[in-house]
Amino acid sequence: MRKNPMDVIKKKHWWQSDALKWSVLGLLGLLVGYLVVLMYAQGEYLFAITTLILSSAGLYIFANRKAYAWRYVYPGMAGMGLFVLFPLVCTIAIAFTNYSSTNQLTFERAQEVLLDRSWQAGKIYNFGLYPAGDEWQLALSDGETGKNYLSDAFKFGGEQKLQLKESATQPEGERANLRVITQNRQALSDITAILPDGNKVMMSSLRQFSGTQPLYTLDGDGTLTNNQSGVKYRPNNQIGFYQSITADGNWGDEKLSPGYTVTTGWKNFTRVFTDEGIQKPFLAIFVWTVVFSLITVFLTVAVGMVLACLVQWEALRGKAVYRVLLILPYAVPSFISILIFKGLFNQSFGEINMMLSALFGVKPAWFSDPTTARTMLIIVNTWLGYPYMMILCMGLLKAIPDDLYEASAMDGAGPFQNFFKITLPLLIKPLTPLMIASFAFNFNNFVLIQLLTNGGPDRLGTTTPAGYTDLLVNYTYRIAFEGGGGQDFGLAAAIATLIFLLVGALAIVNLKATRMKFD
């Protein structure tokens, strides 16, 4: 009797078994749980929450048959959440804090650092280290009285207290040299030497022991007292520092470093619009960023469209060669082209200035004059961007029916009329979304500015470092990493948040304007 094919049970391989699948998922779940707990214990709450959400969603999707379709979407969604949304949330969160090079620690860690500081209080003793078989002996000498003190033999390892006795002479044997002391510096730092009178001394330099005491003492009300000067300090959660207090309880001028991170609310955002040293360069840089992006988009589209029309011209011979030559700037990595142009535009030895000097007797100051520096940026960016627009236009030109040009030729239209009446209107509509994307890209064109001008020439009289060719993204970078008064990550994050809102608003306005124009 012939078996029904439906009755045949498909044999599973060992790697397709449910037991193996659930075992692997269980191990992954345990590993993720351990990592989340570890992150939470270290105070990295945002990382812990993100890891928990992404991992839980992934385990559910790949364990549940009903969510099979989501397996194709999950990698893209997880990537977007991890590399787009997570950095965005982190940036916005930092914008509401005073996080900077001077305020990186938590309050507890900053307090620990201050309490670990000590000051030298008491006599200074010269010390020597002498071998005693497999062990060592510590010898101290008082330079004022000439007395010598000697410890019993000991071995290095961990914190230990050595009782010293007065000795008439130094131990026999060769004194350890500086190399040996340097190699055992950490172990020597853990030794507390107790003198016959009960005073305790510790290593203060590579050749000396001295009496040390904690510089600060933590009082019951949370204030720190300087044991050397008697000044009291209280945590000021408005600025994130321990700050001195006067006798009447008011804040003094002295602040203790390191500081700690606190929430400052909208302070970083208000600084952008109220601090003249930040407001003036910010507004000027914003205007220049918009102008730079608009001019770049206009020139790259114009040059790319015209060249695309020329290389598509039927009467032109050798079109393939021209296409290859015109696309070459797009094939060369942009950072290489930018550095080559930086050499060509060199004010003293660049080929461009040599040629202009020979022809017209002028040598423009490409890097020291704001106007010529901006002109140079637009020239270089047009060179880098037109091949992309040309490739797009070459493809879109194929979609325009030849009947339109034949009909216009019968009406006596010329090449310019064909371009402005037929080609341009039919190309501009499909190009609009790409032009908006190009605008957003050039709005944040960090690499061009950083490699070609580094934002220069610099503006004078500003609170933060700013240059005439800086875009907003470069301005943010300089505040975060190149500030002369320290790296202000909170202010940089606030400006980055404003850039995000500005680019988003401009994109929405452009899309709505385009929709109104073509509807």
Curated annotation (Swiss-Prot):
Gene3D superfamilies: D-maltodextrin-binding protein, MBP (2.40.430.10), MalF N-terminal region-like (3.10.650.10), MetI-like (1.10.3720.10). Its main location: membrane. The keyword Membrane applies. Residues 286-510 form the ABC transmembrane type-1 domain. Residues 1-18, 63-74, 312-323, 398-417, 512-519 are cytoplasmic. It is a multi-pass membrane protein. Pfam families: BPD_transp_1, MalF_N_TM, MalF_P2. The chain crosses the membrane at residues 19-41, 45-62, 75-97, 289-311, 324-346, 375-397, 418-440, 489-511. It comes from the Bacteria. SUPFAM superfamilies: MalF N-terminal region-like (SSF160964), MetI-like (SSF161098). One of its GO terms (biological process) is maltodextrin transmembrane transport. It is found in: Cell inner membrane. One of its GO terms (molecular function) is ABC-type maltose transporter activity. Keywords: Cell inner membrane, Cell membrane, Membrane, Sugar transport, Transmembrane, Transmembrane helix, Transport. Residues 42-44, 98-288, 347-374, 441-488 are periplasmic. The complex is composed of two ATP-binding proteins (MalK), two transmembrane proteins (MalG and MalF) and a solute-binding protein (MalE). Belongs to the binding-protein-dependent transport system permease family. MalFG subfamily. Part of the ABC transporter complex MalEFGK involved in maltose/maltodextrin import. Probably responsible for the translocation of the substrate across the membrane. This is Maltose/maltodextrin transport system permease protein MalF.
